[in-house]
């Protein structure tokens, strides 16, 4: 179970980094928001699922 937690945490860190870099780039480009709105919302949804998954997996490890 520890390895599942570590993989989920690594995925959370990677998605967080991608969103921190990607969202300002999307807002800075002309027509970026209207063209990439779905990608941003998909990333945010994945981030939210990973936050809950890490919390649930953490309760099993400790």
Curated annotation (Swiss-Prot):
Keywords assigned by UniProt, alphabetized: Chloroplast, Membrane, Photosynthesis, Photosystem II, Plastid, Reaction center, Thylakoid, Transmembrane, Transmembrane helix
Name recorded for this polypeptide: Photosystem II reaction center protein Z
- Keyword Chloroplast: yes or no? yes
Q: Name one GO biological process term.
A: photosynthesis
Predominant location of this chain?
plastid
Q: Record's Gene3D superfamilies?
A: Photosystem II PsbZ, reaction centre
Protein family per UniProt? Belongs to the PsbZ family.
Q: What does this protein do?
A: May control the interaction of photosystem II (PSII) cores with the light-harvesting antenna, regulates electron flow through the 2 photosystem reaction centers. PSII is a light-driven water plastoquinone oxidoreductase, using light energy to abstract electrons from H(2)O, generating a proton gradient subsequently used for ATP formation.
Q: Which domain of life is it from?
A: Eukaryota
Q: How does it assemble?
A: PSII is composed of 1 copy each of membrane proteins PsbA, PsbB, PsbC, PsbD, PsbE, PsbF, PsbH, PsbI, PsbJ, PsbK, PsbL, PsbM, PsbT, PsbY, PsbZ, Psb30/Ycf12, at least 3 peripheral proteins of the oxygen-evolving complex and a large number of cofactors. It forms dimeric complexes.
Q: Which organism is it from?
A: Tetradesmus obliquus
Q: Which residues cross the membrane?
A: 8-28, 41-61
Q: Gene name on record?
A: psbZ
Q: Where found, per UniProt? A: Plastid, Chloroplast thylakoid membrane
Q: Does the keyword Transmembrane apply?
A: yes
A cellular component term (GO) from this record?
Answer: chloroplast thylakoid membrane
Q: How does it sit in the membrane?
A: Multi-pass membrane protein
